Amino acid sequence: MDAAGEIQKVASMRLGGSMRGDSGSMWRRGDDVFSRSSREEDDEEALRWAALEKLPTYDRVRRAILPLGGDDGAGDGGGKGVVDVHGLGPRERRALLERLVRVADEDNEKFLLKLKDRVDRVGIDMPTIEVRFEHLEAEAEVRVGNSGLPTVLNSITNTLEEAGNALGILPNRKQTMPVLHDVSGIIKPRRMTLLLGPPGSGKTTLLLALAGRLGKDLKASGKVTYNGHGMEEFVPERTAAYISQHDLHIGEMTVRETLAFSARCQGVGSRFDMLTELSRREKAANIKPDADIDAFMKAAAMGGQEANVNTDYILKILGLEICADTMVGDEMLRGISGGQRKRVTTGEMLVGPARALFMDEISTGLDSSTTFQIVNSLRQTVHILGGTAVISLLQPAPETYNLFDDIILLSDGQIVYQGPREDVLEFFESTGFKCPDRKGVADFLQEVTSKKDQRQYWARHDKPYRFVTVKEFVSAFQSFHTGRAIANELAVPFDKSKSHPAALATTRYGAPGKELLKANIDREILLMKRNSFVYMFRTFQLMVVSLIAMTLFFRTKMKRDSVTSGGIYMGALFFGVLMIMFNGFSELALTVFKLPVFFKQRDLLFYPAWSYTIPSWILKIPITFIEVGGYVFLTYYVIGFDSNVGSFFKQYLLMLAINQMAGSLFRFIGGAARNMIVANVFASFMLLIFMVLGGFILAREQVKKWWIWGYWISPMMYAQNAISVNELMGHSWNKIVNSSASNETLGVQVLKSRGVFPEARWYWIGFGAMIGFTILFNALFTLALTYLRPYGNSRQSVSEEELKEKRANLNGEIVGDVHLSSGSTRRPMGNGTENDSTIVDDDTEVTQRGMVLPFTPLSLSFDNVRYSVDMPQEMKAQGVADDRLELLKGVSGSFRPGVLTALMGVSGAGKTTLMDVLAGRKTGGYIEGSINISGYPKKQETFARVSGYCEQNDIHSPQVTVYESLLFSAWLRLPEDVDSNTRKMFIEEVMELVELKSLRDALVGLPGVNGLSTEQRKRLTIAVELVANPSIIFMDEPTSGLDARAAAIVMRTVRNTVNTGRTVVCTIHQPSIDIFEAFDELFLMKRGGEEIYAGPLGHHSSELIKYFESIPGVSKIKDGYNPATWMLEVTTIGQEQALGVDFSDIYKKSELYQRNKALIKDLSQPAPDSSDLYFPTQYSQSSLTQCMACLWKQNLSYWRNPPYNAVRFFFTTVIALLFGTIFWDLGGKVTKSQDLFNAMGSMYAAVLFIGVMNCTSVQPVVAVERTVFYRERAAGMYSAFPYAFGQVVIEIPYTLVQATVYGIIVYAMIGFEWTAAKFFWYLFFMVFTLLYFTFYGMMAVGLTPNYHIASIVSSAFYAIWNLFSGFVIPRPRVPIWWRWYCWACPVAWTLYGLVVSQFGDIETPMEDGTPVKVFVENYFGFKHSWLGWVATVVAAFAFLFASLFGFAIMKFNFQKR
C-alpha cells in the first residue's frame, strides 16, 4: 500500500473514511467526558506524521493534518485527519484561521511569531530587501498660466505646438517644475518608515520612484537599488508593491472576490520553494511542526487556487470580514463605505508576495483605531518576517505615529529629516523649534516647515523669530549626526553577495500564463453574470427591431418581379447587417469603463493584456449565437427570403461572423481611445467610413478612384456582398423576368444594378473576411492594451505664482509676505505652556471677519429618529427573515447655534446615515420620528434655504475654476437683495477664510484625474456651502483625506464659522487631539445605529473622560493619549462583550440622557414671539436669474471641454472633407435614378452619422454634470428647468458652428445647385437635425439611471430611425400599418426636407423621360409644396426632445442614498 493509502487507513480508523464527516461531532468536544485519552491521541498524531513523512516532498507539502468535521472547526470535534490543502473549502479555511488568529488585534503577533519560530528552528533565512536611493531628481514639464487651461482654442494651439516640437520646427513653451530635488537615503528591512510632508511635497513621486513605477511624463535622474541591484536586474513591480491613494475597483465584484482575484494573479512568490526546503530540513532534523501552522503555510503556498487562505487572513487583519461578501460598488451601485474601499485597495496588494511595501495615504476615511490596528498588523509583519515598508499617512494619531521606527519628512521635494523617530524632535530643537505638549509630533512635523504655521513653534526667546526655509533645514540635517550617519552608510555600496536569492522577483508575472488566463476567464464570467441585464436588454432590443423589420418588409408585400423590388430586398439585407453591427456598440461602454482598473492591474503586472482580451472576446461568442439567432430566426421566413434551408443557415452563420467582427471592432476602438467621449466619436466615424464605402449607399462603379482602396478594406463591403449573393443567387431569384431586355436571371440583374459581384464564391470570401477582421481587431485591441497608457492623467498646468514659489523654495529664497495666514499671528508657544487646542485659540479678528451678511441662528433637535431600508437580497439569501433592515434605532439629540458638534462612531455606526436623514438628503428608505428647527417641524423646501451640506465625496463641475464655482454658488443661494459687489466681497472673505485665495484660478478637474488635490477639493466643498451664508451646516468627514496641516486649516475654517453663531455638525473619523478638542460637544454612536454619548467634551475632554471612566470595567485613559482614540477603543463591540454591558443602555439610564431629553423637549417648543421659517419663493433667485447663472456655468464648461467640443469640430470637418471627396461632384447629376440615390445617400449618411456622433458624445458630458446637478438641486440652488435650459441653450451656438462648417464644405464639393435659397435650406435642415440628435442624447441620459443604459436605449432608436428614414425603404413602399411611423420619425422629415429642397423643383427629364421632380414625388413621396411644413416639423422635434430632457431632469432622481 502506498503512503497516501496508509494515511487514509489511519485517518479512517475513527472516521469511517469520511474526510470531513460530521458523525458524532455534536457531542464529542475537546474536554468531553467521552474524549479519548491524550496518550491515544498523541499516538495517533504520531502515526499520521510518520505516514506523512514517507510521502515524496511534492505530495508532502500539499497535505496537512486538520481537525475533521467539527462544525466550528475549533477543537477536534471529529478527530483529525489528513487533508489536501489545495481543496480547502471556505468553512475549513475559516475554522483554521479562527484557531490561529481569533481576534486580529491580539492574536496576529503570536501567529506571526509561530511562523517565524518554525522557519528559524531549521535555520532558514527570510529574504529581506534594503532599498537605497541616491541623488534622485524628478521634474515635470508644465504649461504655465492660462495656456494650460483646457479650452477649445488652447487644445488646438497646444496640439499644433506639440506636433511642431516633435518635428523640431517650433520652440517648446512648456516650463520645468521641480518635483524631487537631490534626495538620498536608505530604507532598512525590518523597520517601519513613515513618510510625512504637506500636500505637493513630492511624497507620491518619491514612493513611485522607490517602487520603480515613475511615469514617462517625469524627467527623472539618480538611482534606486534593491540589495545593491539596479532596477534593470529584476522586476520591481513584483518585488515591491505600490499601493495607490486612488481606489480603483470593479464595482460589481465583492470584496472577497476582488482580493481573491488579486491573490490568484500575483501568485505565491517563493513561498512554495521555501516550504519545500523547510519540509525537507524538518524531516532531516525529525521536527514536527504545529499542525495548524503547517496547514496554513501549506495552504498559503499553493498557487492556482480560486480562493487562498491568505486572502481570508488579510480580510481578517484589515477588518474587512464584515463586508467580505458585499459588492465594492461605485458611483451608481451601492457598495461598501469609503473607509472600507480604502482597505480593499491596501488588501489587494497585501495578498501578494511582495517583500517591499510602498503605501500612499492608506488611512483616508478610516477611524484612528482601525488605522492603528492595520498599521500595527503591518508593523508585526515587517518586524517579524523581515519586510520593508514605507507608508505615507495624512493624519497619524500619536499612538499610530509611535508604531514607526523611522521618519522621512519631505517638504518641497527635499528631505528635511530621515532617520530614527526618537531623534526627530532633537533635530528640530537644534534648529530652534519645539513641539508643544498636547500636540501630536506628526502634526508638528507637517506644520513646522510651512510658512503659515512655523512661527507658533519658535522656542528661542533670546532671538527674534525669522522664517527658516526648507533649504536651511536640509543643510542643517546634513550636519546633524543622523544625516551624517546616512551619508557615511551610502558611501559604502551594498554587498550584493549578501542578497537572499529569493528576495528579488525575476519572473515578469506571478503565475503561469495559463493560470492568469483562467483567472481572467472566471472573472469575466462573473462580471457577465452581474451585468446580465445589459445582455438581456440587448437581446430584447434586437427582438423588437426584428419584429419591426419583419412587419415592415412583410412577405406579402415583397414581390420578386423587377430590379426595383430586388432593391427593397437589398434594403432589408442591408438593414439586417447594420442592426447586427450596431448591436455590438454597447461593447464600447463596457470596455471603456473597465479600463481604469485594467491599466492599474496591468501596470502592477497582475497579468499580460492578452489574458484579459481573450476572455472578453471568446466568452461573448455564446451570447452572439442567442442574439443573432433571435434576429435571423424571426425575420428570415416572415420577410420571405430565399426558401432554401441552406441559404437560411448560411445567412445565420454570416450574421454570427458579422456580430463578432462588430464586437471586436468596438472593443478595439474603446481600448485605443480609452475615453468614452473620444471613443464614441471615433466609433461613429469608423462606422460611417465602413458604411459609405460598403457598396450599398454608393455603388462600386460610383466610388471615386482615389477612394476605391477604402471600398476594398471596408468590412461592410464584404458583409454586404456575401449576404446579397447568398440571397440573390438562391433559387427564388433564379428566373428570367424580361428575356427581351436581358437573358440574365433576376438575381444577377439586381446584384449588377447595385455593383455587387454576382458570383457564389463571394459568400465564402465575405465570410472569410469577417473571420479575418474579427481576428485582426482582437489582435489590435490586445496591442492597444499592451502598449498604450491610461488616458490623460498627468497634471498639465500650474499658475505663475505656484511655479515661482516652487523654484524659490528650492533655492531657499522667501517669496512674498510670510505672515499672511489666519492664525499665523498667534503668539509663539515657548516650552509648551499653551495647552489649548491651537485651532480654537485663533485670532478674534479672524472670527469676526467674512460675515458681512446677516443670518438667523437656528437650532435643530430630533427625537426618536429611526431609519430603515428594505432588506438587501444578499441578506435574505443568507436566511434573514425580516423585511426591513434598521440602520438607525431611535436616535435623539440636538445641535445648537454657536456650538460645534462632532458626530462620531466606528465605520458602519450610521454617522452619514443620520446626517443624510437630518439634512433631508435620503432618496429612499423609511424615516420615523420628529425633527424640529428652532421648535417648528422641519419642512425640506425651506430647510434647504438655511442649511448647507458638505458631502464626503467632493462633487463639483470639473471644467470651472475655484472662484467661478464659488461665484456660481453665491449668485444662486444668496438672497436677491444682495448686490453683486457685496456678493463678490463676501466670496473674497470666504476664500480668505478657507485659504483658497492662491487657487482662485485653478481648474477644479475630476477627482483622481486632474485639477485640485483632495484637500483643496475638500476646502472648496466647504467654501461652496459657506458662500450660501447658511444657519445650519452639516459636514460629512471634512478632514478625511487631509494631512494634519490641511485638516487644521479646514478645522480653523469650521471653527471660525461656528464662532459667527452658526450651528455646525461634522461627522469625523480619526481626529488628532488638536482637532477633537476644537469641538464643543460630541454625539457618539456605536455600530448598529444607537447613540452611546451625547454631551459636552469639557476642557481637555474632561467631561467625556469622566463619563466613560465612571462605567465599571472601562480602562482609564493614559497621560497624553488622544481622548478620541481612547473613546473609540473602549466602546467597541468587543469591549461590550468583555464587560457584559450595552453602552447604549447605560447611556439611556444616565442623568446625562435625562438632561438631553429635557433640552430636546425645550428646543421642540418655539420661542415666544418667534415665527416659523418662511420664504415667499422656494429659491432665492428668480427663474430668469437661475437660467442665466446655469447658462453662464455651462458656457465656461463647454469652452473648456476639448475632448467633447474640439473633437466633434475636428471630426465634423474630417467627415465633411471625406464626403466631399467620396461624393465629389455628384450633386449636379440627375440623369439616372442611381444618381439621385447617391446624392440622397450622402445626405442620409451625414445626417445619421454626425447626428449619432453628437448624440453619443453629449451623453457622458451630461452624465457627469447630472451628478453635480443632484447636489446643487438638493442644496436649493435652482430648480430643474434652469439647469435644463442652460444645458440645452449652450448647445445651440456649438451646433450652429458645426453645421455651418459641414454645410459649406460639403455643399461646395458635392456640387449642389448654387442658389442662396437652396444653400440656406440645406444649412437650416442640418442645424436643426444636429440639434434634435443632441437633445435626444441628453433626453436619453435624463430618462435612464446611468450612462450605460442611456447609450443602449438611444442606440435602439438609431436603428428604427435608420429603417424609416426613407432611404432603406421609400415611404410609398412601407406597409400601411407602419406608414404612421414614417411621419413620427425625425430622420425621415430631415431627408424629406433635404431632398425636396435640392431636387423637388427640378424639371429636367431623366433618361427614361420622367422629370426629376415627378420621380422624387412618385418614388419617395416627397412634395415640394410641403417644404415649409417639413421645416416646421424638424424644428419642432428639436424643441420636443429638449422639453423632454427638462421634464426627465425634473421628475426623475436616480441618485440612491
From Swiss-Prot:
UniProt KW keywords: ATP-binding, Membrane, Nucleotide-binding, Repeat, Transmembrane, Transmembrane helix, Transport
Write out the GO cellular component annotations: membrane
Q: Which residues hold ATP 1?
A: G197, P198, P199, G200, S201, G202, K203, T204
Residues noted as binding ATP 2 in the record, renumbered to the chain: G905, V906, S907, G908, A909, G910, K911, T912
Enumerate the SMART domains for this protein: AAA
Composition bias of kind Basic and acidic residues appears in 28-39
Compartmental location = Membrane
Swiss-Prot/TrEMBL induction comment = In roots. By heavy metals such as zinc (Zn), nickel (Ni) and cobalt (Co). Also induced by some phytohormones including auxin (NAA), cytokinin (BA), jasmonic acid (JA) and abscisic acid (ABA). Triggered by biotic (submergence) and abiotic stresses (ethanol, PEG), as well as by oxidative stresses mediated by antioxidants (DTT and ascorbic acid) and oxidants (hydrogen peroxide).
Residue ranges annotated for the ABC transporter domain, each copy included? 164-437, 860-1112
Q: Output the superkingdom of the source species.
A: Eukaryota
| Domain ABC transmembrane type-2 stretches | 515-728, 1185-1399
One MF term from GO for this chain? ABC-type transporter activity
Instruction: Read off the InterPro entries from this record.
Output: AAA+_ATPase, ABC2_TM, ABC_trans_N, ABC_transporter-like_ATP-bd, ABCG_dom, ABCG_PDR_2, P-loop_NTPase, PDR_assoc
User: Record's Pfam families?
Assistant: ABC2_membrane, ABC2_membrane_7, ABC_tran, ABC_trans_N, PDR_assoc
Membrane spanning stretches:
533-553, 565-585, 621-641, 653-673, 677-697, 706-726, 765-785, 1209-1229, 1244-1264, 1292-1312, 1319-1339, 1349-1369, 1380-1400, 1429-1449
Q: How does this chain sit within the bilayer? A: Multi-pass membrane protein
Cite the CDD domains for this sequence.
Answer: ABCG_PDR_domain2
Extract the ranges annotated as region (Disordered). Answer: 14-43, 821-841
State its role.
Answer: May be a general defense protein.
Stored PANTHER family: ABC TRANSPORTER G FAMILY MEMBER 39-LIKE (PTHR48040:SF35), PLEIOTROPIC DRUG RESISTANCE PROTEIN 1-LIKE ISOFORM X1 (PTHR48040)
Q: Which family does it belong to?
A: Belongs to the ABC transporter superfamily. ABCG family. PDR (TC 3.A.1.205) subfamily.
**What name appears for this protein in its UniProt entry?**
ABC transporter G family member 36
Origin organism of this chain? Oryza sativa subsp. indica (Rice)
